[in-house]
Regions:
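PLP-dependent amino-acid enzyme catalytic core
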Residues: 1-333
């Protein structure tokens, strides 16, 4: 797959902006300053607030671009199906509703109740199947065949075009960044960042971030081959990938400087930092990039960093437990 060009990203922006406005990027003083030993970053950081979209996450952008392409390329299709842990499904549901399409969304058993409720509010048919995202995806493929629905995969060139629109907003809207941290679920976000950076001719290092409990992309990056791994995250379901997408991996291998792992405890601390310092709610996957920057803050001295807050769709009980410190993350003794 070829990354979208600057012209293609601009075309995607025209589609996206019919349904939403650009999201802000802010440099928050309390995130930036090292007020006391061990606190926050101590560097100039710019937070891209994709938690401010109408769906609460960046996934809406790709879904809008994909739906526009589907309307033109397959006008006979009357419905779509997708597998998700939440944000992809919300984006697909909202885009389908705008175009008058039926949407069937498959989620694993035990999925976030609040994300399920948000998807149902978009008028989707919600189906629970499987124990993780991969099993839900396999069932969604089966439903697509049985019911004549169009399958919206979690990685596709049109989704990358959509995510590249937020990356272009960030990179074109702030002073040149030395490094930008991007969470990796299935890969559309980090690939969109690579597309925007390349289109603008920048030298910004892109750092992908995964949960240590969902290391498939990190392992695949290091070994330069597709590696499956358990996806066990309790706090960052948006990063729960067991089987990486090979097209995404090929782009990551060529365009991303590093892929690092952050612990569940580090993600929880980043969620607390966002709320305490900016009064923004970040879901676990959305806070992973800040967790990575905090982990590497000593090596960031003298640099300007970008941090993508990919989403804020966190359940109330989970968020309350994180803020109170009562949640026992996986991987923590």
């Amino acid at each position: 797959m070829r990354l979208p060009t600057l012209s293609q990203i601009h075309d995607a922006q025209a589609v996206v902006y019919r349904s939403m406005t650009p999201t802000p990027q802010y440099s928050w003083p309390l995130i930036n300053k090292r007020l006391t030993a061990g606190s926050r970053l101590g560097v100039e950081a710019w937070i891209k607030h994709e938690n401010h979209t109408a769906a609460g996450a960046f996934k809406l952008r790709g879904a809008l671009v994909y739906a526009e392409w589907l309307r033109k390329a397959h006008p006979d299709r009357k419905g779509v199906v997708a597998a998700t842990r939440g944000n992809h499904g919300q984006g697909v549901g909202m885009a389908a509703q705008l175009l008058g399409l039926k949407a069937v969304i498959v989620v694993p058993h035990g999925n976030s109740a609040e994300k399920n409720r948000a998807m149902c509010a978009q008028g989707v048919e919600l189906v629970e199947h499987g124990q993780d995202f991969q099993e839900s995806l396999e069932y969604a493929r089966r439903l697509a065949h049985e019911r004549g629905l169009h399958l919206v995969e979690s990685f596709h060139e049109r989704l990358v075009m959509g995510t590249a629109t937020y990356a272009l907003e960030l990179l074109a809207g702030v002073p040149p960044l030395d490094v930008v941290y991007v969470p990796i679920g299935m890969g559309s976000s980090v690939c969109g960042m690579a597309a925007a950076r390349n289109a603008l001719g920048l030298k910004t290092e892109i750092v992908g971030v995964v949960s240590a409990e969902c290391p498939a992309y990190a392992l695949s990056f290091r070994r330069r081959e597709l590696v499956e791994a358990p996806a066990l995250s309790r706090i960052a379901d948006g990063l729960a990938c067991r089987t990486p997408n090979l097209e995404a991996l090929e782009i990551i291998w060529q365009n991303v400087g590093r892929v690092i792992e952050v612990s569940e405890a580090e993600i929880a601390e980043a969620m607390r930092a966002y709320f305490e310092d900016t009064h923004n709610a970040a879901e676990g996957a959305g806070a992973a990039a800040l967790a990575a920057a905090l982990k590497e803050k000593d090596s960031l001295r003298g640099k300007r960093a970008g941090i993508v807050l990919t989403g804020g769709n966190v359940d109330r009980e989970m968020f309350a437990a994180v803020l109170s410190g009562s949640l026992q993350p996986l991987g923590k003794e």
